[in-house]
Amino acid sequence: MVKIRLMRMGRVHYPLYRIVAVDSRVKRNGKYIALIGHLNPALKENKCKLDETVALDWLNKGAIPTDTVRSLFSESGLWKKFIESKNKKETSPKK
């Protein structure tokens, strides 16, 4: 199962995080499949930068975001786009 989660980088007392798609069995800082974005919690504005196309691609493939990543997606508006695209697929008529 593929999860979208945070991978800690940075120094002591100055964390930086990468948002990555990774196999759920891999350790926290292990090898990742795709880099989706990064997070700098020390900044007050623009702390999260995402590649929306890559993130939506992995979400559509069935990757499951952690609670923290889901809240970051909600703040950026990405989660709403994903839900809308998912609802369009379900309501579209089958031929």
Swiss-Prot record:
- Disrupted gene: phenotype observed: Probably essential, it was not disrupted in a global transposon mutagenesis study.
Q: InterPro entries from the xrefs?
A: Ribosomal_bS16, Ribosomal_bS16_dom_sf
Q: Does the keyword Ribosomal protein apply?
A: yes
Keyword Cytoplasm found: no
Keyword annotations for this protein? Answer: Ribonucleoprotein, Ribosomal protein
Superkingdom of the source?
Answer: Bacteria
User: Which BP terms from GO are recorded?
Assistant: translation
Molecular function (GO) terms listed?
A: structural constituent of ribosome
Write out the coiled-coil annotation as residue ranges.
none
Which Gene3D superfamilies would you find in this protein's record?
A: 3.30.1320.10
Q: List the GO terms this entry assigns under cellular component, sorted alphabetically.
A: cytoplasm; small ribosomal subunit
HAMAP family assigned: Ribosomal_bS16
| Listed name of the protein | Small ribosomal subunit protein bS16
